[in-house]
């Protein structure tokens, strides 16, 4: 027994020198727990001790967490001595006289305390430290039988948090002497047995702590560490890694730490100081060199760890890869590889044709039967594996099965390309079906419910169809499922935007109708309050248009399942579009022509009608001139109101957005995805020179105002002249007394007509007919008929006169003959009548 160095930090409980009879670690039989300082957890015959938990429970100073440390190295390098000095354990050490094997199997002890040089008040973690002493390698007792030392090293690596690799300084740089060959085997098997667990727990690592003994100081520790690190990385690169963990690096599994110890005999005090310095690294949590990192722990309680350790040993003990491959296995590997290569070669020829069939099927308009396609995949794969079984099943079973699995993976990998063709086609056709469903307006329930139902049903149908051709899950469907779900979400998102834009369009239409009515009413009689009324109406209609979507918190929810950010963008778009609509309506109702018509209407209302709406009849020019001036002033009162949008307080109407900014117009043209909006923002905008662009409130430019004023003045002056001319005509007409003179001088003629019954009756008939036509509003048509008859008679008379006066003898004779013929006919008629 070696004496325990002091000082030590003793964990709560008994002192290190508890009164138990020591049991030599060279003993090869399990003994009762209550008399042990250490327990042999695996004996030299590879038997696992099931009393570990009882021992740990009896020896632990307190309940709580624990740390597992093991030591690994060549025989007789002082592993047990190091543990005893460092962790105050009582492992049996080598008899230096006989130099024979001391530790057999694997032993464990609970550390009573850690040797250190920390201050008395330094923080000491409360964990129990469990120390495993592993049988040394390269011992003469076992000779060339390396099976146990490989398994023991792998067990220590798999169950420990910190694996202390104990070696002499002179062993650094050696391959066998530094146990690099053994480490290579252990690393390789560790990958095959426990590598997959690394994929599920990416943070877990094991610390390889290299303790270099008898360090003279000539070679710096950094150089020794670099040599060991290079050797380990070279070994790792040469490992035969399983395919699923081949991408993982050495750093993903292990951390490295190094510590040197002076010669125990020649520099004993220095040796003890170095041990205490190493102990500090296990205790001082505030130090950067603290060795117990959280990701080294197995994250299971001690009861679970003992079960885990037993299962690890069982798996390690029954794994044949730790033995050198036999000739039978070598032959099996060669033959199975040969058969597998032949089978795969035949399959590769067929798979090329299968790919062509897949391309043709996806390009055809006929629907694909995915069930039959999947059965075809299975039959083809099964046929290849049956051919392999026929030629390879007679060899070593484990090799045959391993190579069969490899062949199946290669088949799956080849069929994956064909599967991808069908899967991409399925994605496309399924999305088209969903798109058609989205475009249909007949939906039951809310939009969100309808979309959720459509998404679930389409995703279910897609997954079912994809599963039919996935060889019962052997082919990787995840990329296509992920792509389909992403595209499906994108389709739904686009439909949400369509619905959102539809809501905004309806709201803008409602706003347009309300504002149009308001404009008509206000422009019928403009006043100083016109723009106050229009702006008030605009704000009221804008708020009420989306009022039903407003939440109690003051936000807006359009009930489409859109994100709050999208709702805010929609609100901003509506805000901009509403101001743009107001601007468009202003310029629709207040253009140059419309303004001129409004001024003319206002002038006519005042000029042609009085206050009661009765048409005016001007008697003299003085009255006309006064009314004209008043009417013109009344009309022009609306001119400044309708050329500048100004409120009653004198301020101009200023919009919330610059509705004439082209960039803003494109940005708020419609509600879009945030990504699309950002991409468009990054585009270069075509800009024009907007320096001469007038303000929102300036409805007409100065040139347009001048043009309207000129036209208005010209047309009003024309009306004035026309009206004045009618007055002048009225003044210059025949005096009324002339009619009295005519009546007096023509009295006899009037009386003659009245006394003659024929003329009187004719006069009565003409007066009656005139009255009837007047009452039936037929005087106009009658006058037109009379006028046309007069025109026809006049035209006929002119033609006859022209024929008569033509200076042509033949024509004159012909005309005379016609006239004679007519006379004869008249003579005949007269004769007959007589």
Swiss-Prot record:
Residues 659-688 form a coiled coil. Residues 63-296 form the GB1/RHD3-type G domain. InterPro entries: G_GB1_RHD3_dom, P-loop_NTPase, RHD3/Sey1, Sey1/RHD3-like_3HB. Residues 676-689 have a biased composition (Acidic residues). GO terms for cellular component: cortical endoplasmic reticulum; endoplasmic reticulum membrane. Its main location: endoplasmic reticulum. GTP binds at residues 73-80. SUPFAM superfamilies: P-loop containing nucleoside triphosphate hydrolases. One of its GO terms (biological process) is endoplasmic reticulum inheritance. It is found in: Endoplasmic reticulum membrane. Residues 1-733, 779-834 are cytoplasmic. It is a multi-pass membrane protein. The keyword GTP-binding applies. Its EC number is 3.6.5.-. Residues 755-757 are lumenal. Keywords: Coiled coil, Endoplasmic reticulum, GTP-binding, Hydrolase, Membrane, Nucleotide-binding, Transmembrane, Transmembrane helix. Residues 1-26, 670-689 are annotated as: Disordered. HAMAP family: Sey1. Cooperates with the reticulon proteins and tubule-shaping DP1 family proteins to generate and maintain the structure of the tubular endoplasmic reticulum network. Has GTPase activity, which is required for its function in ER organization. Belongs to the TRAFAC class dynamin-like GTPase superfamily. GB1/RHD3 GTPase family. RHD3 subfamily. This is Protein SEY1. It comes from Clavispora lusitaniae (strain ATCC 42720) (Yeast). The gene is SEY1.
């Amino acid at each position: 027994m070696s004496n325990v160095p002091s000082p030590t930090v003793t964990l709560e409980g008994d002192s290190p020198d508890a009164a138990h009879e020591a049991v030599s670690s060279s003993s090869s039989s399990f003994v009762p727990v209550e008399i042990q300082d250490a327990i042999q957890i695996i004996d030299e015959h590879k038997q696992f001790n099931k009393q570990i938990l009882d021992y740990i429970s009896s020896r632990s100073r307190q309940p709580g967490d624990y740390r597992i440390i093991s030591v690994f190295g060549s025989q007789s390098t002082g592993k047990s001595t190091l543990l005893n000095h460092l962790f105050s354990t009582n492992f049996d050490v080598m008899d230096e006289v006989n130099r024979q094997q001391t530790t057999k199997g694997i032993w464990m002890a609970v550390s009573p305390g850690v040797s250190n040089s920390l201050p008395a008040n330094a923080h000491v973690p409360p964990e129990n430290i469990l120390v495993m002493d592993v049988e040394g390698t390269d011992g003469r007792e076992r000779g060339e039988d390396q099976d146990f030392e490989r398994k023991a090293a792998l067990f220590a690596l798999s169950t420990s948090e910190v694996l202390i690799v104990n070696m002499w300084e002179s062993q650094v740089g050696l391959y066998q002497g530094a146990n690099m060959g053994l480490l290579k085997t252990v690393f390789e098997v560790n990958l095959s047995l426990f590598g997959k667990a690394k994929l599920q727990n990416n943070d877990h690592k094991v610390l390889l702590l290299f303790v270099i003994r008898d360090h003279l100081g000539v070679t710096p520790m950094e150089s020794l560490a670099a040599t060991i690190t290079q050797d380990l990385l070279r070994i790792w690169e040469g490992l035969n890694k399983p395919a699923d963990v081949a991408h993982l690096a050495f750093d993903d599994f292990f951390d490295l730490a190094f510590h040197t110890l002076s010669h125990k005999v020649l520099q004993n005090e220095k040796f003890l100081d170095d041990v205490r310095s190493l102990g500090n690294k296990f205790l001082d949590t505030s130090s950067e060199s603290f060795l117990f990192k959280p990701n080294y722990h197995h994250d299971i309680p001690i009861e679970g760890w003992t079960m885990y350790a037993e299962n690890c040993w069982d798996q390690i003990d029954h794994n044949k890869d730790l033995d050198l491959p036999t000739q039978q296995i070598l032959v099996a590997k060669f033959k199975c590889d040969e058969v597998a290569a032949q089978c795969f070669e035949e399959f590769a020829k067929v798979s090329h044709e299968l790919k062509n069939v897949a391309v043709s099927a996806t390009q055809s308009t006929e629907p694909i039967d995915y069930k039959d396609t999947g059965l075809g995949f299975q039959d083809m794969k099964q046929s290849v594996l049956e051919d392999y079984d026929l030629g390879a099943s007679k060899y070593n079973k484990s090799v045959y099965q391993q190579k069969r699995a490899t062949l199946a993976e290669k088949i799956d990998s080849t069929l994956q390309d064909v599967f991808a063709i069908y899967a991409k086609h399925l994605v496309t056709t399924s999305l088209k079906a969903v798109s058609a469903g989205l475009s249909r307006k007949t939906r039951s329930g809310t939009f969100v419910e309808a979309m959720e139902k459509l998404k679930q049903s389409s995703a279910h149908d897609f997954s079912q169809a994809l599963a039919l051709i996935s060889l019962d899950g052997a082919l990787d469907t995840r990329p296509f499922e992920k792509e389909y779900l992403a595209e499906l979400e994108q389709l739904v998102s686009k439909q949400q935007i369509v619905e959102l834009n539809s809501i905004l369009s309806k709201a803008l239409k409602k706003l347009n109708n309300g504002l149009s009515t308001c404009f008509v009413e206000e422009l019928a009689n403009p006043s100083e309050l016109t723009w106050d009324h229009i702006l008030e109406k605009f704000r009221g209609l804008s708020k009420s248009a989306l009022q039903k979507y407003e939440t109690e918190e003051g936000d807006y929810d359009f009930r489409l399942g859109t994100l709050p950010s999208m709702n805010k963008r929609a609100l901003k778009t509506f805000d901009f579009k509403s101001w743009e609509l107001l601007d468009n309506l202003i310029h629709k109702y207040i253009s140059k022509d419309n303004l001129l018509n409004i001024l003319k209407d206002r002038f006519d209302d005042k000029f042609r009608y009085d206050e009661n709406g009765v048409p005016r009849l001007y008697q003299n020019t003085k009255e006309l001139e006064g009314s004209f001036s008043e009417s013109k002033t009344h009309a022009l009162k609306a001119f400044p109101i309708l050329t500048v949008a100004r409120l009653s307080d004198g301020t101009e109407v200023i919009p919330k957005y610059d509705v004439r900014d082209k960039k803003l117009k494109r940005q708020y043209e419609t509600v879009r995805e945030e990504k699309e909006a950002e991409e468009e923002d990054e585009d270069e905008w075509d800009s024009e020179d907007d320096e001469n662009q007038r303000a929102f409130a300036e409805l007409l430019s100065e040139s347009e105002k001048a043009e309207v004023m000129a036209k208005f003045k010209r047309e009003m002056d024309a009306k004035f002249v026309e009206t004045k001319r009618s007055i002048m005509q009225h003044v210059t007409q025949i005096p009324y007394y002339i009619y009295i003179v005519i009546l007096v001088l023509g009295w006899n003629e009037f009386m003659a007509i009245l006394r003659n019954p024929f003329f009187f009756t004719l006069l009565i008939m003409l007066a009656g007919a005139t009255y009837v036509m007047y009452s039936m509003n037929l005087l106009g048509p009658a006058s037109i008929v009379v006028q046309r008859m007069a025109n026809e008679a006049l035209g006929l008379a002119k033609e006859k006169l022209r024929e008569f006066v033509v200076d042509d003898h033949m024509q004159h004779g012909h005309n005379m003959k016609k006239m004679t013929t007519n006379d004869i006919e008249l003579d005949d008629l007269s004769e007959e009548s007589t």
